[in-house]
């Protein structure tokens, strides 16, 4: 149990950050899912549009430290390859 005021403050701060980071990850997943759904339906135009929206969202996640840059690069590369194969 946290006893010092600093430790108590860190717990409050960590809880707030965890909530924000969870929302960011959820948002990234939603954008990625839009691309995957469009690819599954075979809609190239929608997939390209969704990919164009997902890329900056993943980059924002990298900048905020929510997702590792290599993970984002790998996901984007795989999504791009799937969209190009349509």
Curated annotation (Swiss-Prot):
Keywords linked to the UniProt accession: Ribonucleoprotein, Ribosomal protein, RNA-binding, rRNA-binding
UniProt GO BP: translation
InterPro entries from the UniProt entry: Ribosomal_bS20, Ribosomal_bS20_sf
A GO term, aspect molecular function: structural constituent of ribosome
Domain of life: Bacteria
Gene Ontology CC entries for this record: small ribosomal subunit
Task of the protein: Binds directly to 16S ribosomal RNA.
HAMAP family recorded: Ribosomal_bS20 (MF_00500)
Similarity section: Belongs to the bacterial ribosomal protein bS20 family.
Protein's UniProt name: Small ribosomal subunit protein bS20
């Amino acid at each position: 149990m946290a006893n010092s005021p600093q430790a108590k403050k860190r717990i409050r701060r960590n809880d707030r950050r965890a909530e924000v980071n969870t929302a960011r990850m959820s948002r990234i997943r939603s954008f990625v899912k839009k691309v995957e759904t469009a690819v599954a339906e075979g809609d190239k135009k929608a997939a390209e549009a969704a990919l164009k929206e997902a890329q900056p969202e993943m980059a924002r996640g990298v900048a905020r430290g929510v997702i590792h840059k290599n993970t984002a690069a790998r996901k984007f590369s795989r999504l791009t390859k799937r969209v190009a194969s349509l």
